Every structure is written in C-alpha cells, then in structure tokens.
C-alpha cells in the first residue's frame, strides 16, 4: 500500500493542494490515518477517488452529487450507494445528450458546412 500526504496526493492526481483540501472539507475524500502531527495520510484508493471526482467534475457533474455518492460509499450503505450511483449515471447521460445536441448544432453552422464542402 502506498501512503500519500496531501501534497503527494495532489501531485499524483495533477491537481492543486487547495482542491484536495476543498474535497476533504466537502467529504469527497478522507484520510485513512493521521500522523502524530495531525497530518492526513492517504492510500491508493484515495488517489483513485480523487482522480474519479476530478474527472466527473470536469465532465460537468456537480460536487454536491459527488459528495452524496462518496458519503454513501464511505458509509458502506449498499442501497444508498446504488441510488447515488444511479443519480450520477443519469447526470452523465444528460451531459452526453447535451453534448451530442451541441455537436449537431456546431455541424450545422455555416462555417462548418463551408469547411466540409472545401474538403476534397
């Protein structure tokens, strides 16, 4: 098992320390242990979760929905975790549909059609 400090976790996930601390406050992450000095220690599962949360956030999933999912997973409440996973999946599908609609609109723009017509 790897052990990470906040700064190591942030570095490995490609985010700032401020993001990691914000996610800690929101309940998206939690340390597996604390040092005698009170510093959080994180494991590979925390790194994986941080990468997931960041990817979901960048894809347009709100931190509130992600926090509800993480709390359910941390509580080992299978029914609640399944319900929150369904909510996040629904948000992902809505985002996919919105992006597909946007892509169709972009394709119908005059500049896009002119570019396609100019291709050999």
From Swiss-Prot:
Pfam family, one: MerR_1
UniProt GO BP: negative regulation of DNA-templated transcription; response to mercury ion
Domain of life: Bacteria
Keywords: DNA-binding, Mercuric resistance, Plasmid, Transcription, Transcription regulation
Domain HTH merR-type: 3-72
SMART domains for this protein: HTH_MERR
GO function term, MF aspect, one: DNA binding
DNA-binding region per Swiss-Prot/TrEMBL record: 6-25
NCBIfam families given in the database record: coreg_MerD, MerD
Name of the featured protein: HTH-type transcriptional regulator MerD
Biological source species: Shigella flexneri
């Amino acid at each position: 098992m790897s052990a990470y400090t906040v700064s190591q976790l942030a570095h490995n996930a490609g985010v700032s320390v401020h993001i990691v601390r914000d996610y800690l406050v929101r309940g998206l992450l939690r340390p597996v242990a604390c040092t005698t000095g009170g510093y959080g220690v994180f494991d590979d599962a925390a790194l994986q979760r941080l990468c997931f949360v960041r990817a979901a956030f960048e894809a347009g999933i709100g931190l509130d929905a992600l926090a509800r999912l993480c709390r359910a997973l941390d509580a080992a409440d299978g029914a609640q975790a399944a319900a929150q996973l369904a909510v996040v999946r629904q948000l992902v599908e809505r985002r996919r549909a919105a992006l597909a609609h946007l892509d169709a609109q972009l394709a119908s723009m005059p500049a896009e059609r002119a570019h396609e017509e100019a291709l050999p």
